[in-house]
UniProtKB/Swiss-Prot annotation:
Family label: Belongs to the CCM1 family.
Subunit field text: Binds to mitochondrial small subunit 15S rRNA.
UniProt lineage: Eukaryota, Fungi, Dikarya, Ascomycota, Saccharomycotina
A GO-annotated cellular component: cytoplasm
PROSITE patterns: PPR
Source organism of this protein record: Eremothecium gossypii (strain ATCC 10895 / CBS 109.51 / FGSC 9923 / NRRL Y-1056) (Yeast)
Entries under Pfam families matching the protein: PPR_2 (PF13041)
Protein purpose: Regulates mitochondrial small subunit maturation by controlling 15S rRNA 5'-end processing. Localizes to the 5' precursor of the 15S rRNA in a position that is subsequently occupied by mS47 in the mature yeast mtSSU. Uses structure and sequence-specific RNA recognition, binding to a single-stranded region of the precursor and specifically recognizing bases -6 to -1. The exchange of Ccm1 for mS47 is coupled to the irreversible removal of precursor rRNA that is accompanied by conformational changes of the mitoribosomal proteins uS5m and mS26.
InterPro entries the record matches: Pentatricopeptide_rpt, PPR/CCM1_RNA-binding, TPR-like_helical_dom_sf
Keyword Repressor included in the entry's annotation: no
The protein's name in its UniProt record: Mitochondrial 15S rRNA processing factor CCM1
Chain's gene name: CCM1
Record-linked PANTHER family: PENTATRICOPEPTIDE REPEAT-CONTAINING PROTEIN, TETRATRICOPEPTIDE REPEAT (TPR)-LIKE SUPERFAMILY PROTEIN-RELATED
Molecular-function annotations in GO: mRNA binding; rRNA binding
Amino acid sequence: MILKSELLDVHTRLGQMLPFVTKRFASVPTAMRTRRRTRRHEREPNLRKRQGGSHSNLKENEDAELKFKLRQMNEFAKNLKMQMQLADSLRRKEEAARAEGIGGDVAEGAIERDSSTVAAALLEGAEPAEAQPAPLNLSQLIMSAQNAEPLLAPELAERIGDGKLVYSALVNKRAQNWDAIVAALYESAEKLRGLDADIVKEKLLLRVSGLSLEGVATLDKLLTDRFGEGRDFDVDMYGVLFETLGEHTQHTQQAKTVVDRMKKLLQRYDACDDPDKKPLTQEILNCCLKVGTAAKSFDDMNYFLSKFVKDYRILPNKVNYDQVLTFYLKNRTLSQAWETFGAMKFMSLSHRPDVATYNLMLQVCDQERNYSKALDLYHEIQDLKMEPDVRTLSMLAKAMASASTDAIVSEGKSDSLRLTGWKFIHEIENNPKYATAKDDPVCAHGVLTTMMALASYDGDVGLARALFYRHAVQSYKKLMKNANMDAVSNPAAAARAAWTQAIDPVLFNYLLMAYSRYQPNKLPILLGYELGAKFRRQLMFNVDYMGRAESDNDMHANIPLLPVMELSSTAEVLNESRALWEFFLSKHINGSLQPQPSARVVSMLEEYRQNHDTFEGFMKEVKSQVKRWQWHAVNRRLMTPITIMSYLSIPLRLGSYEEFAFRYKQTIYTGNELEESVKNFYDPALVTVSDEATVVVDDSEVKVEKYARKIDDRILQIYSFAYKNRVYNDVFELAMKAATKFRDNSLATRVWKERGEFRKTEGYTSMSVKDRIAGDTSFACATVKFFVAEKRFSEAMAVIMSSQKYIDWKYHMVRELHNALVSIEDSVSIRKLLSVVNKQNRLKVLNTESPSLTP
């Protein structure tokens, strides 16, 4: 910028050189003080230019710049890796097709046509179109000089003799079908005979994966046919079998079957008397412990541990001890988990607990709702100079959330514990070193579950809805993308099936808990500080409940959530929770839990009634049919005892008696209700209309229509049980609490009678003694509280005195009754009540009141 004095000097000199030019003065406008394009500087920070300011500002700027660069590099590496994998997969497919003689020329022409598409996508940083992938990228340039590996070793492919089978089974690296390869080898004439052991291990055993239980049995027969059951069947082959069997731990019953097969393999290994046979390994022991954990069997775990220690001289290592901790965690034997964890600290350095072990113990703290132990473990991690990972911070926050639900455990600091949990979540979100770990689906789901727990226990319905909706829509779109809707004849039915699979039962239960804890006048804890308010606002603004985005055009159906960010009344909470329950649990295309039986159902019931001469046989047939209907009509993956309790707790806590009665009738049924409905349909006396039809001829059609309508109502009543769940212990306790809150004496009487009838059913007698006592204790406590609320103290005392032999009464169970007796100064009842509660005085009371047996 030219200053004014310099400008005057220039004009003076120009005037001296050019006398005929008139001197003029010009005013030059100054530059604008406002800086432009600030958004560009914020989005693309300059790492070389250091801005001035305090040390704290410099540190914050450096952290932000480093975080930005890390995200940029991770995104670039992710795109590059994806393109390399795509090109490598296509190259291998083409070379395998050429080796098998399947369409080589056609595939080569397709590669040449699609090369420009992939090259352009790499330059632009975008994904190529799925229909036109091309392998001309960096991966192909690097591997162009290498020889292509065949999908299957030539020695094995020759024995199969079917190139198309090999190609179709192994061409997709992400979903290879080794069951077909193993079955084809076993059905071949030569099988594995004549092949060297090294070739079998390298070309088959090291590559095989994802075998079913039948495939593992076939592979075992294949190896036994070649190597026998003696010395030639070495440890490496046993290791492959055990490792493949260890993958089948999805269900407890399946795990028990796998345990039996593992025991047979160990018996076969013991039957070999060769002194030079190789010993088993720690990996095999860990596979056995993994399956024993899934089977939830103490006997199986003791069998494997004792056998490997005594017979094979293999002591458990740290990985094995972690598996033992997982077993204790699943079986809720938490005291033994603490003992094992304490023993690991005093073993060798190789057994010292690491972050993974501490994460398991944080889950134990979560189950115990012990936040103090969780914080102590976190301080131990810091003192040992170990680096906590995302799972560590997530489990810490989860333990804080669980402890905040119990007023006694939290010591009146529920909000402080939830605030501490949210601080751990903020550390995960804002720390750059956890940026890459959050891309792991397991870690991301764990953080999401923890956030849902914190929001639900705080009653933050707005945040819980946003998190649930975002996860549900993402899962639904992924399922619909894989479903290939163009080839589906009924898109609405496919969308309904996708929604039933997209919902996580744990997240759905947390959303129901958030509804039940809703308070219109309560401020969410995140709004109490600036960072939390900003974090909550960002999450809620990223959700579009209306589905107006362009990517939501193909959703075919949307979740029935109100198109608002925050719910403003209990009526909205009740209506939305009921709509979600019916939408997700019903497998019907319209999402309704009010079924209409088809003509096939009507004819089936009529046929059952005609084929059975006795009511008992008809009742047995209908019960089995109702169970089959329940699996096909309702999404049983979501309709669990836990979600049912959360669903029924919403109107109970919000104080809506009509809504609670409607949901209870819609969701729960007893055995007597089913029996009465079936008897009403079966008994011929209830459906005889011949006399009425012959009295007046003109009214015959009216009588017949009335008769048909009654039959339809009975069938509808029977079919409605397919959409309900049979009553169980916790439901009786919840119903008694509802009778206490709503002061409904008739409901309490009915629940008391139904609970007595439930004790005679097979569902109660099949329970363990521990579970039966726990159920009786909780229901007795709820009954005592009802009698106290109704000021029927003598009946409350009768319940306690009659059950003291089976129930271990504590003072916190009878606190309300004791305070009520003190208020009316009933000293006799107080003395009896304290004698039952106080364990030390029980023996004295029995000795003084019971008659002596000696003269």
